[in-house]
Amino acid sequence: MNTMTLTPGQLSLSQLYDVWRHPVQLRLDASAIDGINASVACVNDIVAEGRTAYGINTGFGLLAQTRIADEDLQNLQRSLVLSHAAGVGDPLDDAMVRLIMVLKINSLARGFSGIRLSVIEALIALVNAGVYPLIPAKGSVGASGDLAPLAHLSLTLLGEGKARWQGEWLPAQTALKKAGLEPVALAAKEGLALLNGTQASTAFALRGLFEAQELFASAVVCGALTTEAVLGSRRPFDARIHAARGQQGQIDVARLFRHLLTDTSAIAESHHHCHKVQDPYSLRCQPQVMGACLTQLRQTKEVLLAEANAVSDNPLVFADAGEVISGGNFHAEPVAMAADNLALAIAEIGALSERRIALMMDKHMSQLPPFLVKNGGVNSGFMIAQVTAAALASENKALAHPHSVDSLPTSANQEDHVSMAPAAGRRLWEMAANTRGIIAVEWLAACQGIDLREGLTSSPLLEQARQTLREQVAHYTQDRFFAPDIECATALLAQGALQRLVPDFM
């Protein structure tokens, strides 16, 4: 069990990855408590003094001008959660719900939200007990925060809706009881604090980033394997070429290729004096294309890490000044744009991989048997596997369309520009699955190509990559049912089988 002491505003990317991958036992760092209590005291003072403050004693959205009587404040917060839990679609899996919950706790514990420590501790208790609220995947436009998803999360705190406990969907009240927990009653501002925020959008995009990192590393390894399979040159990875341009991502990717390929191999020596002058772009320009993708991954990391540690509530409580100020930190435009840029990178990683697969199919370009199989005609080899890769690459081109340029006004035009960040992040998952399928086909094809260079071997690391596959998937001597091999290679990639061969690049 992963144990984590949460210091609000200081989550690292590796901690977020661990939260996504594994159940966690959270403990709130004691340094957060004074700030949390001070913000609650500020809210209580506003109520006691009869001052009007949005979200504390007013309605919401277009109804913000409606003053709410003190005796209705608790009911106001409960009603807010119930009415806003209007999501649709399949439930998010436990890993995604857990990540959203931890992001929410991290934001609330910063001490700008006016929410009691006991409510934050109730959220922590849900995480620690493995009680996962049923959160539908769809229903947020990423401003004013992720209202519907976070309302569904908050329902479980109230004992409403459904939650999953030990793999079983239960009424939330039952799940809480089985876990030894009690529902909470919300005080002034607490419902709004729970619902306002970009935590669902950020979690969606973070998953996309985590998957993109694996895809990037796997594609670099497969690109190096393909370079060997088609007797490509190592010269385009010369450090001097990339230093002359000065693009850091490109420089770093070329270094990764030099690490994987080493100075030479038996395959490289076999064509050292060949007549070829230049390789096709899908080989020669790998550092340039993958370097640009790496730059996007790094920029996305910076944006999402900042957002993961941000306060995206509204209004914000500045206890030291005794003020509650309305702003727009709930607007997830930074997340939407980061997800859009990441989508371009995921699409290009797959597109370049597909072009290398196509290169291996062409006997004139690869100097290998057509479609990587002997006795062609009787055998079709990798012919349709390449078609599958092309289909996946084409789907990704459509999915890469930017979401952040779209907006539909909501809440009777009070919320007249929105980010569409949840959709921007969520489509990354499908794109990642598509790209993983493409890379799986390339891995199969490149290893087949190297096998066909009979008696010749590649570099030690690339031989490891080939051996890892060959332990699960046999060499193709004649046609066989192909889909299980793609499924096997895809599963190995998802487990990080090739990623572990690549030094840290983020």
Curated annotation (Swiss-Prot):
GO cellular component, one term: cytoplasm
GO biological process: L-histidine catabolic process to glutamate and formamide; L-histidine catabolic process to glutamate and formate
Top EC class of this enzyme: lyase
One Pfam family linked to the record: Lyase_aromatic
UniProt family annotation: Belongs to the PAL/histidase family.
Modification after translation: Contains an active site 4-methylidene-imidazol-5-one (MIO), which is formed autocatalytically by cyclization and dehydration of residues Ala-Ser-Gly.
Domain of life the protein comes from: Bacteria
InterPro entries: Aromatic_Lyase, Fumarase/histidase_N, HutH, L-Aspartase-like, Phe/His_NH3-lyase_AS
Name of the protein in question: Histidine ammonia-lyase
Subcellular location: Cytoplasm
